[in-house]
Amino acid sequence: MQFLKCIECDYSGREYADQLGYIFNLEKNKASSTQKWLDNLEVSCRQRCNECSYKLTYQIDYKKAPEILVLEYPRTNIKSSHRIKIKIEDEYKVFSLKNVIYHGNNHFCSRIVSVDGTIWYNDGITTGNNSIEDGHLSTTSYEELKTCNGKILVLAIYA
């Protein structure tokens, strides 16, 4: 569910529920971690407030938890949290990091996180159909997740 909100005068507009998903731009966000960013989900829009003419935003509130979250990290320094939680009405749903995708030199590679936390590295060019064990999530820091073999983190998948 989303509704229009003015951060200048606290005006709230009508609700919308026709959106199946959202693309959030982390590039303009000042949050230091994925969790802090998700705590204040909002998307800017072109409409202006009827009361003060300030630019409105869509405030995002989930009524039902999504099954999967895919977050893009374009040129940001935000920490990719190992676990994140989203408030759904009066309860929280916890999502675990499942995959991190990296890009560099016109090529992608990824780290897949298994249920037990084992990290598996995959690069179709160098590993083919095989994945290589690459540590454990419990001993891997946020800093270590930012890069992989000279490539930078561009997507994180949570479920």
Could you say what each language-model-derived stretch is?
Residues 1-159:
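UBL (ubiquitin/ubiquitin-like) substrate-recognition surfaces
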